[in-house]
């Protein structure tokens, strides 16, 4: 059976077959730019579907782990080649589902392909170290082994890159996978899984189950047949997933929220800083865990910098993300839009000054979508809600400070610690920032939202469970170490 039926319905993929869920029910996936555009219908899966997928993954894991890393890597190379042929199709689907602009979606899809090829190559790298023994006649070394079955719970904001940067290392290091994507972008995930299928992965090695997090995601976290769970999403849900995995002794990895600061020092290149702030805050309509949220500016340049941000914001074109002249698309869903608008209202209630934007767009070409104007707040203090909580929308909180020391204190004055950036020409300030900022990603003269696939990704404090994704660091989560002592 194909990934899609004639009714534009997308199926689960379990044990090498495209199948309907046990419930027989489906969930509508709509385009946030125009809710009358139905991207497709996906399965509203049940606990029985989770059971079938986990069983298939367990049955496949022994044969899969017995392949060499190089052999497993070949499947990733083939998948990457197939995805490359379908880049336009996958990117357009991601845009229709999530709302990011088509150039952004194409870039993300290209990145997903690059991630596959990167981890395909990792299958040829060493899996252990030789360690000197105190016994001169003995050999001691480490080797890495797969965990078994990995449950992947992926978010809607990066529907291509994040599922792949979880699945690719899991697979190449010898694990089998059951993925539960966010329902909002489940069609894109189905198209990606179809590429793995065409690449010839053995039945049961990769499985797709769509449906509600409370059933499918929670089911994976609680299932004794799932050896590890990797999750990206909200702090609220992440804590539930982590507690469920911990309760049964399973390995878990959580990547969650951020409240990412950019410090603009009085010696900064203001043009470069303004462009980076606008891009970091408003690209993908602010729906990135690494998006710029707080902009902390020294008082001597505050007014000049504020004007640059306002002018750049006025030039932003908002609309259907598939159109070439659009710079910022819609919010991904009604719930997300309502959440963003509630934070904007909260900012005004607490005394911040809304300088620009922040209005829901609902007339004319916007009437069928989830649109909001990008917003910039002035007169923000660190204790305000909009300076403390993740909004996940196009909202900047401007904070004025007198010194870099004050800026650093405010930057660290949140429960999150994912990404942080500073703009300065002073090497001393750069080094102090690197040393003192509480963030897993530290950016100097660059926007907060930049990530490279070959480097570790993850946060501090409540942004993460303190493991790292991507690059060689992924090996630490997706494998277990055996220490071997050999006495002839």
From Swiss-Prot:
Top-level division of the source organism's lineage: Bacteria
Keywords: NAD, NADP, Oxidoreductase
Alphabetical list of SUPFAM superfamilies matching this protein: ALDH-like
Binding site for NAD(+): 180, 233-238, 336, 390
Molecular function GO terms recorded: 2,5-dioxovalerate dehydrogenase (NADP+) activity
EC identifiers of the protein: 1.2.1.26
Active-site residues from the entry: 255 (proton acceptor), 289 (nucleophile)
Keyword Transferase belongs to the record: no
InterPro entries: Ald_DH/histidinol_DH, Ald_DH_C, Ald_DH_CS_CYS, Ald_DH_CS_GLU, Ald_DH_N, Aldehyde_DH_dom, AlphKGSA_gudD
Enzyme class: oxidoreductase
Consequence of gene loss (knockout): No effect on vanillin degradation.
Recorded catalytic activity of this chain's protein: 2,5-dioxopentanoate + NADP(+) + H2O = 2-oxoglutarate + NADPH + 2 H(+); 2,5-dioxopentanoate + NAD(+) + H2O = 2-oxoglutarate + NADH + 2 H(+)
Family of this protein: Belongs to the aldehyde dehydrogenase family.
Self-association state and partner proteins as the record states: Homotetramer.
Function, in words: Catalyzes the NAD(P)(+)-dependent oxidation of alpha-ketoglutaric semialdehyde (alphaKGSA) to alpha-ketoglutarate. Prefers NADP(+) to NAD(+) as a cosubstrate. In vitro, can also use various aldehydes.
Entry protein name: Alpha-ketoglutaric semialdehyde dehydrogenase
Species of provenance: Bacillus subtilis (strain 168)
GN (gene name): gucD
């Amino acid at each position: 059976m194909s990934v899609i039926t004639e009714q534009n319905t997308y199926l689960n993929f379990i044990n090498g077959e495209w199948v309907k869920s046990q419930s027989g029910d489906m969930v509508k996936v709509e385009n946030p730019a125009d809710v009358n555009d139905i991207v497709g219908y996906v399965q509203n899966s049940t606990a029985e579907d989770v059971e079938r997928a986990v069983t298939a993954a367990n049955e496949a894991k022994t044969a899969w782990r017995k392949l060499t890393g190089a052999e497993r890597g070949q499947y990733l190379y083939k998948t990457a080649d197939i995805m490359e042929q379908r880049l336009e199709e996958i990117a357009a689907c991601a845009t229709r589902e999530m709302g990011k602009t088509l150039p952004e979606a194409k870039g993300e899809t290209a990145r997903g392909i690059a991630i596959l090829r990167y981890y395909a190559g990792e299958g040829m790298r060493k899996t252990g170290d030789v360690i000197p023994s105190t016994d001169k006649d003995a050999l001691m070394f480490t080797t890495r082994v797969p965990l078994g079955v990995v449950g992947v719970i992926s978010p809607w904001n990066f529907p291509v890159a994040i599922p792949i940067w979880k699945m690719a290392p899991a697979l190449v290091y010898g694990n089998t996978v059951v993925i539960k994507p966010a329902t909002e972008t489940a069609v894109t995930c189905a198209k990606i899984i179809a590429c793995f299928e065409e690449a010839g992965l053995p039945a049961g090695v990769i499985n797709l189950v769509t449906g509600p997090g409370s059933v499918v995601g929670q089911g994976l976290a609680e299932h004794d047949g799932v050896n590890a769970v990797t999750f990206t999403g909200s702090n609220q849900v992440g804590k539930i997933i982590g507690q469920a995995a911990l309760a049964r002794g399973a390995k878990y990895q959580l990547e969650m929220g951020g409240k990412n600061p950019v410090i603009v020092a009085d010696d900064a290149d203001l043009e470069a800083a303004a462009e980076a702030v606008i891009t970091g805050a408003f690209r993908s309509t602010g729906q990135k865990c690494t998006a710029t949220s707080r902009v902390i500016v020294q008082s001597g340049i505050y007014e000049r910098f504020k004007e640059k941000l306002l002018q750049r914001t006025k030039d932003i074109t908002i609309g259907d993300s598939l159109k070439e002249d659009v710079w910022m698309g819609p919010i991904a869903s009604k719930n997300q839009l309502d959440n963003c608008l509630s934070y904007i209202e909260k900012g005004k209630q607490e005394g911040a000054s809304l300088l620009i934007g922040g209005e829901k767009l609902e007339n004319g070409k916007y009437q069928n979508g989830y649109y909001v104007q990008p917003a910039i707040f002035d007169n923000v203090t660190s204790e305000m809600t909009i300076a403390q909580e993740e909004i996940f929308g196009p909202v900047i909180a401007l904070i004025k400070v007198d010194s870099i020391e004050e800026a650093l204190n405010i930057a660290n004055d949140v429960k999150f610690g994912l990404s942080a950036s500073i703009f300065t020409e002073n090497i001393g300030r750069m080094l102090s920032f690197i040393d003192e900022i509480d963030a897993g990603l530290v950016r100097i003269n660059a926007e907060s939202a930049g990530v490279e696939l070959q480097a570790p990704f993850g946060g501090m404090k409540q942004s993460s469970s303190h493991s790292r994704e991507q690059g060689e660091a992924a090996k630490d989560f997706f494998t277990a170490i055996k220490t071997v002592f050999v006495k002839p």
